Amino acid sequence: MSSTQDEAILRNARETIDSLYDLSQLLQTGLDKSTLSICVGMIEQGANPDTLAAVIKELRSENEALNSQSNA
C-alpha cells in the first residue's frame, strides 16, 4: 500500500472515531475517545457488543462501590 492510501485509511479511521465519539457524547456514555477506540477494535475482532456494554457497566458499578467505601 502506498503512503497516500495509508494516510487516507488513517484519516477515515480518525473521522469515524470522531463521529462515534460525538454520538457517544450525545448518548452520555461517558466513554473517552481512547476507550471508544478500544471498544470498536474489540467489536471488530468479534466481541459481542451487548456483552462488552455489560462488562463496562459492571466495571463502573464496582468502581463506584470502591470509591464509596474509600470515602466512608
UniProtKB/Swiss-Prot annotation:
Classification via Pfam families: MOZART1 (PF12554)
Cell compartment(s), UniProt: Cytoplasm, Cytoskeleton, Microtubule organizing center, Spindle pole body
Source species, domain of life: Eukaryota
Gene Ontology CC annotations of this record: cytoplasm; gamma-tubulin complex; gamma-tubulin ring complex; interphase microtubule organizing center; mitotic spindle pole body; spindle
Keywords: Cytoplasm, Cytoskeleton
Annotated function: Required for gamma-tubulin complex recruitment to the microtubule organizing center (MTOC).
Complexes and interactors: Part of the gamma-tubulin complex.
Record protein name field: Mitotic-spindle organizing protein 1
Species of provenance: Cryptococcus neoformans var. neoformans serotype D (strain JEC21 / ATCC MYA-565)
High-level lineage: Eukaryota, Fungi, Dikarya, Basidiomycota, Agaricomycotina
